[in-house]
């Protein structure tokens, strides 16, 4: 379970970075060269999703829970926004959903 969660976390970071760098280019006028590491990050994101031993749709559904938490961590650390009780509550619910799906992988 821990290995799966850590893999999802790294996967989420790759997806967020791969989307954040073009956002910097479009919204903040960063160099177009940031699109190269963005593309590499998104390619790594896709590859990491293939490392799970479940059907793709089930992996994407479970990954979503960790993505929500990682995005909120990004919101706090990178964007400097203080998390609310609603953020924390949503993250907890998302992680519970991920846990239920992952535990069920071996039972279907």
From Swiss-Prot:
- What is this protein's name? UPF0060 membrane protein YnfA
Question: What gene name does this entry carry?
Answer: ynfA
Q: Which residues lie on this side of the membrane: Cytoplasmic?
A: 27-30, 82-84
Q: How does it sit in the membrane?
A: Multi-pass membrane protein
Q: Which family does it belong to?
A: Belongs to the UPF0060 family.
UniProt key word Acetylation: no
- The protein's organism comes out as Salmonella typhi
> Which residue intervals are topologically Periplasmic?
1-5, 52-60, 106-108
Show the HAMAP family listed in the entry: UPF0060 (MF_00010)
Q: Where are the transmembrane segments?
A: 6-26, 31-51, 61-81, 85-105
Coarse class of the primary localization is membrane
* Entry's Gene Ontology cellular component terms: plasma membrane
Provide the taxonomic classification: Bacteria, Pseudomonadati, Pseudomonadota, Gammaproteobacteria, Enterobacterales
PANTHER family linked: UPF0060 MEMBRANE PROTEIN YNFA
Organism superkingdom: Bacteria
Write out the annotated subcellular location: Cell inner membrane
Q: Which UniProt keywords apply?
A: Cell inner membrane, Cell membrane, Membrane, Transmembrane, Transmembrane helix
InterPro entries linked: UPF0060
């Amino acid at each position: 379970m821990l290995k799966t969660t850590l893999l999802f976390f790294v996967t989420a970071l790759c997806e967020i970075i791969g989307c954040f760098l073009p956002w910097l280019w479009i919204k903040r006028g960063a160099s177009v060269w940031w699109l190269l590491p963005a593309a590499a990050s998104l390619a790594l994101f896709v590859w990491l999703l293939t490392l799970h031993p479940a059907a793709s749709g089930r992996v994407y559904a479970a990954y979503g829970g960790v993505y929500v938490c990682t995005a909120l961590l990004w919101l706090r650390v990178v964007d400097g926004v203080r998390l609310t009780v609603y953020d924390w509550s949503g993250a907890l619910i998302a992680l519970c959903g991920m846990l239920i799906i992952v535990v069920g992988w071996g039972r279907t």
